[in-house]
Amino acid sequence: VPKIESIRPGGTLEASFSAYPLAELLLGILRGNLTGRLDLFLHPEPRNVVFFKDGVPVSVQLPDAGVSLAKILIDSGRVPHEQGLDLLRMAEASGRSEEQVIQQHNVLSPGVLDEARRRRARAQLVRLFDASPLDFRFQEGVALPAGVPLTILQPLPLVYEGLVKTQDRTVVNRFLEAHARSTFDLAPTFPRGVDPFEWGPQVERVVTQLPPPLSVARLAQAGLPQEVALAAITSLHLASMLELREQGPGVRPLAAVAPPARPPPP
């Protein structure tokens, strides 16, 4: 599959996440500073789409990704548990979206609803890290239609969270097979003084303050869980924020701890 960065103006790339994992696709779109439309074939109708502008997701519309807005509001404490379940039941009974029901009953301020949309959009994209057989199509140059709700997300935190949570080991296995025992230095492209991947204070402190060189083993020895250490190093490597210090041998691939989630049948 050709790299998304090499797409021609107005061009189209069609593939599946098994051939072109979502982590690599998101970073390729970011690296290429691309604007366009990403269709995800979760449903026979063309209704699951992500719009990008200058490499960044700016509108996420994935009704078939299986993430409930009402449950996000419950989990974040924005609505009481029973009220949230009532909203969910009303949406299911009426055939409307949860968002339409919430807006009709005017239970949230616009700011709270916007934040819930962003949380849902992030959760939807992270969930797709396990949808390895899923087909997609990216069309370069397609602009965001007027009136479409904005859900602007940063790609680097999406990649890190997706690598931590996914059961599909494709991306981390590629790294392990090549660099499991390699050592690295942070590249000058890594922005010091910020947390570009939204690792959180503990991970950010270990990665940036641990005396070089960096490796999966050294991050784990410094107290990070193995899956967090692996996701942090892999995301840095994918984002071209590591410089190889010493090439070490790879290891055998990890097996998935659970079968990857598959999209619903048409």
What are these regions (language model features)?
Residues 1-266:
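Acidic, Ser/Thr/Pro-enriched low-complexity segments and adjacent helix/loop capping patches
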